[in-house]
Amino acid sequence: MNRYTDQVVLVTGGAQGLGAAMSERFATEGAHVAIADVNIDAATALAARLQAETGHTCTGHAVDVTDSAAVTAWADELAARLGRIDVLVNNAGIIRDNRIEDIGDHDWHAVLDVSLSGSFYCARAVLPHMRSRGYGRIVSFSSMSWRGNFGQANYVAAKAGIVGLTRTLALEVARQGITANAIAPGLIETPMLASMNGPARDKLIAKIPQRRTGTPHDIAEAAAYLCSPAAGYVSGIVLDVDGGLGIGSSIR
């Protein structure tokens, strides 16, 4: 199934982890994937591998999403060269966890600048190109923690902001063939989670109704649906991809 044949898909933070899984998913379905990451070596290496494996053009780009002028220039250059921008996935983000009184100004601003401001800058940059063709899909990454979580005030503020940004964006573009949605991942299998000791890991998994962690593949599948033509009547939602954890459980 090639839902993205000839489409241009932009993925920020697209060179590693969940971003890499999504970049691969879109490439396997025929998209030209523009992989943006501050780690240009990782981005270009992944793009080269995906292009070799899928036969579809993939490119790596050094993009700092906190630089609004650079983001706009990147989007404009891609649109001019490729003739279109169909999909934006706002995945770039960082974590600087601490109690509120121990979060310094730098760590507060760093998290919001990358996750929230970066998502805003990227969405603003691609909108003119989507509007001109009457089609677009924007998916931004929130988190199950957007409702509040101990020791993550900066992260929670950013992820809650993404929910508000997504809903407002969905309203503003509702009659322009563009949708905007957010994904809120739960506990996803990552190197950090895998490194946890057995009891601590088991305690977390016991809170998940499905009794397993999610995988990058789970996230990539969710993104591939929301960004597809089939999801044209889905807009303004927060899709929990958490194995049911958000039904009523909380992490302590």
Regions found by a protein language model. Name each.
Residues 103, 145-157, 168, 196:
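Active-site loop-to-helix junction immediately N-terminal to the catalytic Tyr of the SDR YXXXK motif
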Residues 40-41, 62-73, 105, 217-218:
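The beta1-alpha1 cofactor-binding region of Rossmann-like NAD(H)/NADP(H)-dependent oxidoreductases
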Residues 89, 174, 179, 234-236:
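Short, small/polar-rich loop/turn modules that mediate ligand/substrate recognition or access, typified
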Residues 123, 158, 166:
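Active-site helix of classical SDR
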Residues 99-100, 107-112, 204:
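Substrate-binding pocket helix/loop in short-chain dehydrogenase/reductase
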Residues 3, 235-252:
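Short C-terminal tail/terminal secondary-structure segment
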